[in-house]
Amino acid sequence: TRVRSSAASDVYKRQIEEEQDRILKTRKQNRTQSIADMVIRNYGHLDEKINFYQNLRSREDYFSRHSLNVAILCAMVTHVMNIRREEQYHTVCAAILHDMGKVKKHDAVYYGAPYTREDMLRNCETQEEAYGIIEEAFATDGSGIRRICQQAVRKQLDLFPEDGEKSRYKMLAGANVLLVANRYDEITAMTLQGTAQSEVKALQELLEHPKVYDPETVRALIRSINILPPGASVELSTGEKALVLNENEESVLRPTVVSFRDNSILDLSLPGNEDIQIVDVMKTMDNRYIFNK
């Protein structure tokens, strides 16, 4: 499994911070392409799943760490989906810049995963303010990058169909990838208050809204990162605690587990066990993951 060192992550985080600030001030990009190329070179050609690594975040580096994580997820998912190289590049660039409009904002609503329509609207409005700058900052690729950003942020409002019209346009593949990657990281990242939700909770949300989060894209995310690898401790809907023995590639939330209570083995994919659900995973409080070397 590929290892991403903390030192390397900090370097890329600083580069993203500097690039976002430069574009906002000068309306010109300088290093976006090289950052995107680096991410694609390291994560856009992997043929194995990785344990997705979450860093602790501060108010000062929240958006740059988020942008880096989303860019990494986008590189992996576009590779799994065999998206053509140009759109993969546009998608990773969009991930690097999609939250640029929030950089100078300090309201709590911009940190973490928005769960109400009002929060979503504020996020959308703030992000879209910066998207015109993206097209201006790039000589030739700006239009494609901007469209991916705009489609992804607007599609989020379809989570609240009773309060507004659904988007009518055909989503670009890259926009679907950005939408899924962004939401996954929003949910699983450590908040400024020190709380986080698990990858299981994130995946449950993505799977519950197939009209918003493209199912093919969600499947590609599942093929890119470990959600419930062997050895993961889980809580079942029966109240029991269990250990994952074998993954289920077809239905990742229904693996084979062994109960801590009596060492019984349960294959959650069998019809007889369909009433038993995985409620959540059990992990350390700081939400950090260890990469296998």
Tell what function each PLM region has.
Residues T1-A8, Y12:
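Single conserved hydrophobic/aromatic residue that forms the stacking wall/gate
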Residues R14-K293:
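Histidine- and acidic-residue-rich, metal-dependent catalytic cores
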